[in-house]
């Protein structure tokens, strides 16, 4: 989106996810458009290099355990003195304060402690964790918004940067709805309900088709529920007291699912989707990646794009979102596999270090 991003390269990040011929695929997409440098912050010369880098930077993001930067003499006060306009995002599992601040924090712990896992899964099954790093992703999104707010405040009001304390735990908890208020006012505790949301309406579930595919259907709004019953050839159900309004459908949710699921199970996915589309019902296929890549809507919007990678050749990955009308984002490069790929550019060209100095720092293990 126009900003220059530099990431401190680490070997451990390259061991995550799938690989092809030893090349980490997760790394390729997660760190696209970022310049990768190596930097040993436990070394005094590494600390001095960081101070030079942040002298004219807008934002610095770190995710060390609280107190680590201070141990290296790189705490907020020091960084702010060097660059009063700098915004520093401090990401940690549990935040910079509180009794858990020194605990190691991972997304899995946040997904558990936020209440997300407790409300996810089947009623008779275990708490269910997401199939990808949801908590980490949410923390990244919240961090991005926070940075934009801080930069706006700096540029239009105070002229000063600030420190942003972001835990991985709290963003995900924030997205889990009205649970705190419902417990405070009603003593209600939300439990696992599978794909149903009985507090909102019915039908809302996933249903298997005759040919083994799955469809997701949501008819929480009264008008949508009426359309579903008409679409499946049961218009009389709209006058049945058991299904006439949302509250009644929730009370008879098992019967609703049996009726809707029975009809869907007797039809192929193509037949069911066509029928529901005709009646403007809210229904969609449950896709794996093959469905996404072959879907004409994803193709028309170029949701998945192809990037030229120097090692793998043309590779597919998610495109930039959202779509800006005047200044669209672009994927300029995939993440380089070689550690410290941009060391010479950043340290040599930007900071003015000589090739001899770079070689010396590399020999010492500073970069």
Task: Please identify what each model-predicted range represents.
Residues 125-135, 208-213, 327-330:
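Flexible glycine/proline-enriched surface loops and loop-helix/loop-strand junctions
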Residues 244, 312-360:
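Flexible, small-/acidic-enriched active-site or ligand-binding loops
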Residues 278-332:
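A glycine-rich dinucleotide-binding beta-alpha-beta segment and adjacent secondary-structure elements
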Residues 203-279, 283:
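Aromatic-enriched alpha-helical interface/lid elements that frame and gate functional surfaces
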Residues 140-162, 174-186, 229-235:
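Oxidoreductase and adenylate-handling cofactor-binding alpha/beta cores
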Residues 3-157, 344-367:
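N-terminal helix-loop segment corresponding to the beta1-alpha1 unit
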Residues 96, 124-134, 155-172, 192-199, ...:
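Conserved Rossmann-fold dehydrogenase catalytic segment
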Residues 27, 194-199, 205-206, 312-315, ...:
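Short Gly/Pro-enriched turn/cap motifs at secondary-structure boundaries
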């Amino acid at each position: 989106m126009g900003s220059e991003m530099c990431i401190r390269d680490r070997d451990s990040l390259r061991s995550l996810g799938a690989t092809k011929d030893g090349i980490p695929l997760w790394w390729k997409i997660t760190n696209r458009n970022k310049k990768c440098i190596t930097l040993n912050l436990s070394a005094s010369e590494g600390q001095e290099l960081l101070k030079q880098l942040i002298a004219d930077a807008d934002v610095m993001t770190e995710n060390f355990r609280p107190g680590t930067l201070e141990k290296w003499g790189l705490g907020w006060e020091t960084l702010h003195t060097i660059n009063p306009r700098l915004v520093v995002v401090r990401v940690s599992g549990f935040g910079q304060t509180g009794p858990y601040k020194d605990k190691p924090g991972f997304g899995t712990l946040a997904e558990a402690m936020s209440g997300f896992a407790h409300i996810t899964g089947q009623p008779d099954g275990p708490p269910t964790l997401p199939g990808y790093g949801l908590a980490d992703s949410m923390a990244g999104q919240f961090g991005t918004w926070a940075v934009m707010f801080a930069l706006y405040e700096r540029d239009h009001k105070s002229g000063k940067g600030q420190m942003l304390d972001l835990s991985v735990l709290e963003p995900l908890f924030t997205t889990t709805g009205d649970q705190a208020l419902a417990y405070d006012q009603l003593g209600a505790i939300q439990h696992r309900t599978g794909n149903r949301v009985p507090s909102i309406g019915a039908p809302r579930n996933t249903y298997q088709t005759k040919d083994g595919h799955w469809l997701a259907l949501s008819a929480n709004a009264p008008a949508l529920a009426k359309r579903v019953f008409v679409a499946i050839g049961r218009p009389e159900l709209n006058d049945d007291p058991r299904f006439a309004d949302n509250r009644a459908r929730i009370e008879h949710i098992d019967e609703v699912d049996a009726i809707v699921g029975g009809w869907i199970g007797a039809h192929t996915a193509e037949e069911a989707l066509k029928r529901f589309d005709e009646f403007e019902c809210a229904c969609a296929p449950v896709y794996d990646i093959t469905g996404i890549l072959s879907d004409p809507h994803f193709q028309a919007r170029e949701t998945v794009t192809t990037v030229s990678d120097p090692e793998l050749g043309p590779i597919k990955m998610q495109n930039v979102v959202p779509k800006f009308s005047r200044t669209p984002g672009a994927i300029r490069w995939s993440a380089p596999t070689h550690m410290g790929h941009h060391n010479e550019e950043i340290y040599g060209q930007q900071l003015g270090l000589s090739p001899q100095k770079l070689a010396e720092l590399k020999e010492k293990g500073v970069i």
